[in-house]
Amino acid sequence: MTILPISAFSDNYIWTFIDKIAGVLDCVDPGEAGPIIRFAQSNQLTLRTILLTHHHYDHIGGVDLLIKQWPSCKVYGPIDERINNVTHPIKQGQSVQVGSLHFHILFNPGHTSTHISYYEPQQGWLFCGDTLFSAGCGRVFDGTIEELHESLLLFKKLPRNTKVFCAHEYTLQNLKFAHTVEPCNSSVINYMQQILKQPSPCTLPSNIDLELSINPFLRTDKEQVKQYALSHGANSSDSLDVFKVLRNQKNSFK
């Protein structure tokens, strides 16, 4: 099985699992139908499964057309009335079988109130929607900042070699903010230089080990990150207080 990011909109990735022997593909968060339909048709593939992480249009906008094209396609997603056409509603603690892949469902509210992620422990793959980005994290919409903080603490506990398949290409801009927070962090500096030199604009997947070294939202226990937060209005150096300031500062960062 092959994993391929299919681009959508300006910076979305629709992660696809391709099994050419079986003649099928599966995808995560198809915000647009066109790219998936064109890819499937050009490779003589049938869409078997759609996995959804949350209700935002750039993640579910293609579902209607895709299930019209492939009526037998299974659609997994969180229990949320804002998402239509989910054939298999799922929640924390359940699992999803997609071909040979066995995904555990992680409840990760914060970005939205019902956000979930798909974790495949045998392969070490995490499809985290808009909860975690490389060197960053999602904004808070209808979830809470406390929930988002807890969701990222959960990700910190995953094995370090876990590959992180984020839904957006935000890495370079996130690294610029990370460098503002930790100007002496050599991991941030080196990784920024690396991706500026690489020929491909795609920086994903990332991995938990890398994120623990470059992502300020996973580094709220580090002294320089604490000092940055305290100098920008944090009430204390407690992890949640630091996280709140980081998220607020990132919201207005240019």
Curated annotation (Swiss-Prot):
Assembly description: Monomer.
Function, in words: Thiolesterase that catalyzes the hydrolysis of S-D-lactoyl-glutathione to form glutathione and D-lactic acid.
Record keywords: Hydrolase, Metal-binding, Zinc
Pfam families reported in the protein's UniProt record: HAGH_C, Lactamase_B
Cofactor binding note of this UniProt entry: Binds 2 Zn(2+) ions per subunit.
Protein name: Hydroxyacylglutathione hydrolase
Binding-site residues for Zn(2+) 2, renumbered to this chain: 58-59, 130, 168
Family: Belongs to the metallo-beta-lactamase superfamily. Glyoxalase II family.
PANTHER family with a match to the protein in the record: HYDROXYACYLGLUTATHIONE HYDROLASE, HYDROXYACYLGLUTATHIONE HYDROLASE GLOB
Molecular-function annotations in GO: hydroxyacylglutathione hydrolase activity; metal ion binding
InterPro entries documented for this protein: Clx_II_MBL (IPR035680), Glyoxalase_II_hydrolase (IPR050110), HAGH_C (IPR032282), Hydroxyacylglutathione_Hdrlase (IPR017782), Metallo-B-lactamas (IPR001279), RibonucZ/Hydroxyglut_hydro (IPR036866)
Catalytic activity: an S-(2-hydroxyacyl)glutathione + H2O = a 2-hydroxy carboxylate + glutathione + H(+)
Cofactor(s) in the UniProt record: Zn(2+)
UniProt superkingdom: Bacteria
Enzyme class: hydrolase
SMART domains noted in UniProt: Lactamase_B
BP term (GO), one: methylglyoxal catabolic process to D-lactate via S-lactoyl-glutathione
EC number(s) stated in the UniProt entry for this protein: 3.1.2.6
Pathway where it operates: Secondary metabolite metabolism; methylglyoxal degradation; (R)-lactate from methylglyoxal: step 2/2
Binding site for Zn(2+) 1: 54, 56, 111, 130
